[in-house]
């Protein structure tokens, strides 16, 4: 159920890496998706003036360093730093290093963790088209009533037109 009278907010949205997993589950073609939603790939989130003015922090999507059975990476890094062998801790984050150099690539091994920056209204339209291609029927209207079973589950929804839609799964995407 969707109403043409209720618009969507067309703003840029930042996602997190789990979005990528959702798209894999839905078998969404990444190139098509990025084109349709005017999206870009992001390797982390940048926080400007994080602690002090002019001091930025990038929260990279991914892991820093490689741990092993003996200990976590941070232990090796701290020991190396104490001996003068280690670079900055952030230098061991592939996502952060790629972000700082404005680089990205789909690698066969050591896949970079990433997310997207997208136009929310274009994404809603894209998902609608995908769903309709899979047989989902879009019903124009406004929900004015929600009827529940004795256990509290949704039994059906009533539209402004009087149409009653029953179902087993209802998802509110407002």
Predicted regions: what they are:
Residues 8-97:
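Dinucleotide-binding Rossmann-like beta1-alpha1 core, especially the glycine-rich loop
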Residues 139-156:
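A conserved short coil-to-beta-strand element within the FAD-binding core of flavoproteins
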Residues 159-169:
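Core beta-strand elements of the Rossmann-like FAD/NAD(P) dinucleotide-binding domain
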Residues 14, 110-130, 138-141, 173:
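Short beta-strand to alpha-helix junction loop
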Residues 1-5:
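Conserved acidic E/D residue at the C-terminus of a beta-strand in Rossmann-like folds
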Residues 94-122, 156, 164:
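Helix-loop-beta segment of a Rossmann-like dinucleotide-binding subdomain
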